[in-house]
Regions:
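C-terminal non-catalytic alpha-helical accessory regions
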Residues: 44-139, 562-574, 578-594, 601, ...
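Short, hydrophobic/amphipathic alpha-helical patches that form generic packing surfaces
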Residues: 79-90, 148, 152, 254, ...
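His/Asp/Glu-rich acidic catalytic environments and adjacent acidic regulatory segments
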Residues: 2-42, 46-47, 93, 100-302, ...
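Membrane-entry segments of alpha-helical transmembrane domains in multi-pass membrane proteins
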Residues: 28-40, 63-70, 264-268, 307-314, ...
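C-terminal, non-catalytic "cap/extension" segments appended to globular domains
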Residues: 2-32, 38, 42, 226-228, ...
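Active-site-proximal, well-structured secondary-structure segments within enzyme catalytic domains
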Residues: 142, 146-147, 185, 189-230, ...
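Short pre-active-site segment immediately N-terminal to the catalytic Zn-binding motif
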Residues: 463-482
């Protein structure tokens, strides 16, 4: 036992000093939850101190002494404390949260929003920025973009408002920030609260062995007998696709599609309504008629009219085929169930699978044995090597935040260090559903000319391994991996001076191009042959099976397109509101996407209350971006199809002109530099087999 006067080494907050880790990676093992709040508050204090120095600088404002310092990525310190702690905390909140994290997020959200407002609404600071904006020297394209972004960022945050307007804006943005956080926390709790517990093995009828094993493992982990199914995609999707138990499918479907609507503390209905109104008020306070007008100024689409044109063009092109696809499903169901059978939404995946089996003799479970996760990783990494010459080396020296996470060092084709890549593969308690890419550190060039390399992370919810089998993925999960890996390449290839313009820091309707571009490879036979080997026998996937994958790529493609379009219509319906939004969410939703719907709508289901993208994920008035980027990716990939899907010269052009440039120039300028022309919808229609 130590005596009271024993001198002990005082523990230091890891965020306050150099990490002294490989590549300055996050020392997760040394970070305690109390470190976050301390670092947030100290980071705010340091920011305030730097801003005070800046506004009192006696020298005339210049690009270097004002804009670069405001950008806060190339300051005197080699890192920005507030940015440093924020990136780690944000990742943990979505990938490895707990009640303490949630409570801290609730506490810090208004404090951080207030600080952001204090910066953007600082009159003396804006005067310096405005002076540079109006009196700057000749700038490079990247410097001009940074200056424009800086000035516009302050104006769009209320710098030109009077004091009363600024105070009103503070209140609106702080409330919106808190409600967005509440929305996400409610949704996560709703998602994790529901389970379908089965103890009668007969009720597993139709389910493949992989789904049964995963459910048995879930039950075991929950100290329950039998089998446990959840609303996480790797559990939910196989049940809806294969289970012959129609009533259980209904229960699972209704649980997932009514999240956030129940009479409990996790209800999101009023939160959604309030967020729509808050964003409209913010936009109108800043001189825009609608929130969509406010957002689309800095998008390739430019305005709501162009967004609606894209969505309506897609409806016109795809709807006839989508209607026929649904009729084919209904015929398939009636052949089995009789002419009086009425297909419900919880039957859709089940009969879609049956129809796919009849037409192509293909189903996800046939493919799983060939998509062992470790082999898929090799295939995806190998694709990057073949295209760009980069290589990946797993590192046990780089700390991770959970045992599921793997860390890799990435090296460029000349052998130089390129990036750190983290991969977090499987669902677990405290982890949000879905898949996303994030960064623990961006890329920039510091004052000494050192190219600081990025640390990127992809977070997914792929099928878990069981006691009997390794993680065996579906083709859809392989596609998800490729999608997020495309985002990560955008981050890893970043090569810009300023971090705020690097990697994925681009306009939102351009950001999905690199990710959706990579999805194209999931049905390319030459790529599949590089890694699709049976996990037991080592035999390659038979050519006949690969051919069936390629032939079936457009199965239900028109329906899938209209489903995405419907989400885009819903998003635009909310954020083109000019007056106070007072409608009931659920009926409003049904009306908003009606023209894109080709299947039955249920009165109680609701997408809005779980639509994280547009309520809490930055895609408000921007969900159309997925279809916009799909036009771009189909057009871009057509060049690879012409020159060879592994053509290194084409890949180098894609890297040099798009992936490495970030947001340093207008996206269309970058795209045309790669493609030689603006994109058209033709390549997308051709890829999907749609004729106009």
């Amino acid at each position: 036992m130590l005596e009271n006067n024993t001198t002990q080494t005082e523990r230091k907050n890891p965020f306050f000093e150099p990490y002294n880790t490989p590549h300055d990676t996050v020392p997760f093992n040394r970070i305690e939850i109390g470190d976050y709040e301390e670092a947030f508050l100290e980071g705010i204090r340091r920011d305030d101190e730097e801003i005070e120095k800046l506004v009192n600088d006696p020298e005339a404002p210049t690009f270097e002494n004002t804009i670069v310092r405001v950008d806060n990525e190339n300051g005197e310190n080699y890192y920005d404390l507030l940015s440093r702690v924020s990136t780690v905390f944000s990742c943990m909140l979505s990938a490895e949260t707990c009640d303490e994290f949630d409570a801290l997020a609730q506490k810090m959200s208004p404090i951080l929003t207030k600080h952001a407002n204090d910066v953007k609404l600082n009159k003396r600071l804006f005067e310096r920025i405005k002076y540079v904006y109006e009196n700057h020297r000749e700038l490079t394209a990247e410097e001009q973009m940074l200056l424009d972004n800086c000035y516009d960022g302050f104006v769009r945050s209320g710098a030109l408002l009077d004091d009363e307007g600024k105070e009103r804006l503070r209140n609106l943005t702080e409330e919106a920030s808190l409600l967005s956080l509440q929305f996400s926390q409610n949704l996560l709790k709703e998602n994790k609260a529901f389970t379908l517990h089965i103890t009668d093995e007969a009720q597993l009828d139709g389910l493949p062995e992989t789904a049964r094993e995963a459910a048995a493992l879930a039950a075991k982990e929950a100290d329950k007998e039998g089998w446990l199914f959840t609303l996480d995609y790797p559990s939910y999707s196989p049940f809806m696709t294969y289970s012959t138990q129609r009533e259980l499918r209904r229960q699972l479907y209704m649980a997932r599609n009514t999240e956030g609507t129940h009479d409990n503390t996790e209800n999101n209905l009023e939160i959604c309504k309030r967020l729509v109104n808050l964003r409209r008020e913010i936009a109108q306070l800043l001189g825009y008629e609608t929130y969509a007008d406010y957002v689309l100024v800095h998008r390739m689409a430019s305005n709501a009219k162009n967004v609606y044109k894209l969505l309506n063009d897609l409806i016109d092109a795809y709807r006839p085929t989508a209607v026929e696809e649904v009729k084919a499903l209904e015929r398939e169901a009636k052949q089995t169930e009789g002419d009086d059978f009425v297909m419900e939404p919880w039957d859709f995946s089940f009969y879609s699978h049956k129809l796919q089996m009849r037409e192509y003799n293909l189903d996800a479970e046939m493919l799983r044995p060939y998509f062992e996760l470790s082999k898929v990783i090799d295939g995806v990494f190998g694709l990057a090597t073949r295209l760009y010459g980069i290589t990946f080396k797993e590192s046990k020296d780089i700390q991770v935040y959970h045992p599921d996470v793997k860390a890799y060092e990435v090296f460029d084709k000349d052998g130089s260090f390129l990036a750190v890549f983290y991969a977090d593969f499987h669902p677990r308690k405290g982890k949000q559903g879905g898949a996303w890419m994030t960064e623990f550190q961006g890329q920039w060039i510091d004052r000494k000319g050192v190219n600081v390399r990025p640390h990127v992370s992809v977070v997914m919810n792929l099928t878990k391994p069981t006691d009997e089998k390794p993680a065996l993925l579906t083709l859809g999960e392989v596609e998800t991996f490729l999608h997020e890996f495309g985002h990560s390449l955008h981050g890893m290839f970043a090569n810009t001076r300023f971090e705020s313009l690097s990697g994925t820091n681009v306009w939102w309707d351009f950001v999905e191009l690199p990710s959706q571009f990579m999805e194209n490879y999931s049905v390319e036979k030459e790529f599949l042959r590089t890694f699709a080997f049976h996990y037991k026998t080592g035999e390659p996937m038979p050519d006949d099976l690969i051919e069936r994958i390629v032939r079936s790529r457009n199965f239900m493609a028109a329906y899938a397109c209209l489903r995405q379009v419907s989400f885009g219509l819903l998003d635009m319906a909310y954020y083109t509101q000019k007056e106070e939004f007072a409608a009931d969410i659920i009926p409003f939703e049904k009306k908003a996407w009606e023209k894109a719907m080709v299947t039955k709508q249920l009165p109680d289901t609701c997408m809005t209350t779980q639509f994280s993208h547009i309520m809490a994920g930055g895609y408000a008035a921007g969900y159309y971006s997925y279809k916009w980027a799909e036009v771009l990716d189909a057009d871009a990939f057509s060049v690879f199809k012409k020159n060879g899907i592994f053509d290194q010269k084409t890949a180098q052009s894609f890297r040099d002109n798009i992936l490495s440039k970030g947001g340093t120039e207008h996206p269309m300028t970058l795209y045309k530099r790669f493609r030689g022309q603006e994109p058209t919808i033709d390549a997308l229609l051709e890829r999907n087999g749609i004729k106009r």
